[in-house]
Regions:
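Active-site gating/metal-coordination segments in enzymes
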Residues: 79-178, 183-184
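Generic structural signal for well-ordered alpha-helices
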Residues: 66-70, 102-109, 134-135, 162, ...
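Short beta-strand segments
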Residues: 10, 80-85, 121, 210-212, ...
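Conserved, mostly hydrophobic/aromatic
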Residues: 12, 73, 105, 137, ...
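Catalytic pocket-lining loop regions of alpha/beta-barrel enzymes
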Residues: 140-148, 154-261
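Short, solvent-exposed loop/turn segments at secondary-structure junctions
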Residues: 14-16, 86-90, 123-125, 151-155, ...
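Mid-to-C-terminal alpha-helical segments outside catalytic/metal-binding sites
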Residues: 1-11, 18-75, 79-80, 136, ...
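Short aromatic-enriched loop/helix-cap "lid" or pocket-rim segments at secondary-structure transitions
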Residues: 19-25, 94-95, 131-132, 189-190, ...
């Protein structure tokens, strides 16, 4: 398969992928600063990033403008990218450390003229407003999904504070996507164990769910969830395809090829697509992961 053979769909890009400087305020928070020196410590050193400029370590992965992102999409064969109104809670500071607005995402969707798929997010400490925003985003702006970061709120996906979200997504007929696995930021990650989604999948059998971020370090459990539940899918965002576990690659190329979605988490469309195309799986499986599964799941 050549790079442009499939017009891919990135099911978890980020609003800041085309505007790097908007991540600056995140690095006022302990979690993001610590992530820079931990998860991204090698990159920090390689790029010679100085204290106080930690935001540049993630910005180095992004494009300088919306136009540059569209040009990259055209160059490598990416038809659509997903962007959501991300909300994340600081465990240390007890405040939202990421809080993107519905309106910002709507602007990205308008700019994209069909190339950007809009999504909402969820704050379980502001349930009423979150549900109102989700309904508005879907009904007025045509947004297609919700992405939720339960780990940052200290909640497992089966916590009762999350259930209003699932009910609303089911009512609106949209998938819910949420992070499982550990968090790159220093957040208590036990609640990210993929098996906590088991009860949700059973309680909401008609709700389409996407478990994001591969579930690492519990990849086998993530695979189990996708394989056992007809309504559960997963994406590989935040991990470069060449670094995926052999078990995940085997699953993606075999019995799980209809359940896995391509995603970058803003880590670079070109590198992430190139490495996916180079994986030792069939072209048919690659096509499903890069495009077909997303098109079917999100009714694109």
């Amino acid at each position: 398969m050549e790079l442009k053979d499939v017009q891919a769909i990135d099911t978890m890009c980020r609003v800041f992928y085309c505007e790097p400087e908007i991540v600056k305020p995140h690095f006022d928070f302990y979690e993001f600063r610590t992530m820079a020196y931990g998860t991204f410590g090698g990159v920090m050193k390689k790029l010679g990033i100085a204290p106080g400029e930690e935001w540049k370590v993630v910005a180095s992965l992004y494009k300088p403008s919306f136009e540059a992102m569209l040009a990259e999409m055209d160059e490598i064969g990416v038809e659509k990218v997903f962007m959501d109104a991300t909300k994340m809670w600081s465990f240390r500071h007890k405040a939202l450390m990421a809080d993107y607005s519905l309106e910002l995402v709507a602007d990205r969707v308008r700019q994209g003229k069909g190339r950007v798929v809009g999504g909402l997010s969820y704050n379980p400490f502001e349930i009423k407003k979150s549900l109102e925003d989700i309904e508005k985003g879907v009904k007025e702006y045509g947004f297609k999904y919700v992405w939720f970061h339960p780990i940052s709120f200290g909640l497992a996906p089966n916590d009762k504070k999350c259930y209003p979200l699932y009910g609303k997504c089911l009512e609106l007929g949209i998938p819910v996507t949420f992070q499982v696995g550990h968090s790159a930021e220093p957040l208590p990650s036990e609640v990210g164990h993929p098996m906590y989604a088991d009860e949700v999948a059973i309680d909401f059998p008609d709700l389409k769910m996407v478990l994001t971020h591969t579930g690492w370090p519990w990849v086998e459990e993530w695979i189990s969830m996708l394989w056992r539940h007809p309504n559960v899918y997963g994406n590989i965002g935040a991990y470069f395809p060449k670094d995926l576990s052999p078990a995940l690659v085997e699953f993606m190329g075999g019995r799980g090829q209809n359940k896995v979605l391509w995603a970058t988490n803003g880590f670079g469309l070109t590198r992430c697509k190139k490495e996916l195309v180079e994986l030792p799986i069939s072209d048919g499986a690659k096509r499903k992961v890069l495009r077909d599964n997303a098109a079917n799941l999100f009714n694109l």
